[in-house]
Amino acid sequence: MKVSSHEMVPTHEIIPREEIPLLLEKYNIKLQQLPKLLDTDPLVLETEATPGDVLKITRMSPTAGESTYYRLVIATSL
């Protein structure tokens, strides 16, 4: 079963690498300041994202309408 097909799971998409600097500039942050997602996360695996990719997560909120979040994919270290 695809995790993303569940109605409660927000949309996840990989931001093109060339757009990451624009995102960081827009929010005046550094890459490492983004919240993290492990490369073993089911949605990271489903989107085929790799460490260093940034995922754009779009979800609907009853109070705010559409909300967008960004997460940096990091490698799992054992």
UniProtKB/Swiss-Prot annotation:
GO cellular component: cytoplasm; DNA-directed RNA polymerase complex
Localization, UniProt: Cytoplasm
Pfam assignment, any one: RNA_pol_Rpb5_C
Domain of life: Archaea
InterPro entries: Arch_Rpo5/euc_Rpb5 (IPR014381), RNA_pol_subH/Rpb5_C (IPR000783), RNA_pol_subH/Rpb5_CS (IPR020608), RPB5-like_sf (IPR035913)
Record-linked SUPFAM superfamilies: RPB5-like RNA polymerase subunit
GO BP field: transcription by RNA polymerase II; transcription elongation by RNA polymerase I; tRNA transcription by RNA polymerase III
EC code: 2.7.7.6
Alphabetical UniProt keywords: Cytoplasm, DNA-directed RNA polymerase, Nucleotidyltransferase, Transcription, Transferase
Main location: cytoplasm
Reaction(s) this enzyme catalyzes, per UniProt: RNA(n) + a ribonucleoside 5'-triphosphate = RNA(n+1) + diphosphate
MF term (GO), any: DNA binding
Subunit structure: Part of the RNA polymerase complex.
Protein purpose: DNA-dependent RNA polymerase (RNAP) catalyzes the transcription of DNA into RNA using the four ribonucleoside triphosphates as substrates.
PANTHER family: DNA-DIRECTED RNA POLYMERASES I, II, AND III SUBUNIT RPABC1 (PTHR10535:SF0)
Family: Belongs to the archaeal Rpo5/eukaryotic RPB5 RNA polymerase subunit family.
Record-linked HAMAP family: RNApol_Rpo5_RPB5 (MF_00025)
Protein name: DNA-directed RNA polymerase subunit Rpo5
Gene name of the encoded protein: rpo5
